[in-house]
Amino acid sequence: MKTRTLALMGAAAALALSVGLALAGPGEPGHSHKSFAAGEPGDPTKPVARTIEVTMKETDDAKMLFEPNKVEIKRGEQVKFVLRNHGQVDHEFMLDSIENNAKHKVQMQKNPDMEHDDPNGKRLTPKDSNEIVWRFTKAGTFEFACLIPGHYESGMHGTVVVK
């Protein structure tokens, strides 16, 4: 009886795993079923049109900022953002629409320690660096922002204009 029960449990587990893998779809780089306002995750195996270095830091007069804070991109371009936290506190880079970042900012007020390692956002500790490869498939004005409570209000946001 034990052997039969174990065999049935094993078969059920295998079936559940195969159904989950089938629903997951292809695992190719840059492929995602999630929709993003600012485009889609890029494919790191393909060349980028350019690399944009973005520095995060605080100033002596208590401001927090990104350098640069405005970027212009051609629709269809794949770019690599190299993110560097030169500050003394954690910062994040969230790329989305202004409206979506505003909604996310409300969530961050409730959970300020929320970690980000998403296709469109990264949280960095001081002196840390990371990268985001992104393909801008939609024209418009988008925003990158640090949504850690108080950082946006201290000036930590920028604009991406896609033409």
Protein language model regions, located:
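Extracytoplasmic entry segments of secretory-pathway proteins
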Residues: 2-56
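Divalent metal-coordination and catalytic microenvironments
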Residues: 54, 81, 93, 146
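Short structured motifs
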Residues: 37-38, 65-68, 115-120, 129-130
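Asparagine-centered strand-capping/turn motif at beta-strand->loop junctions
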Residues: 83-85
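Histidine- and aromatic-enriched segments that form or immediately flank copper-ligand environments
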Residues: 88-126, 152-155, 159
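A short, structured loop/turn motif at beta-sheet edges
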Residues: 44-47, 75-77, 135-139, 163
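Extracellular/periplasmic metallocenter environments
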Residues: 25-33, 118-163
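N-terminal edge beta-strand
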Residues: 47-78
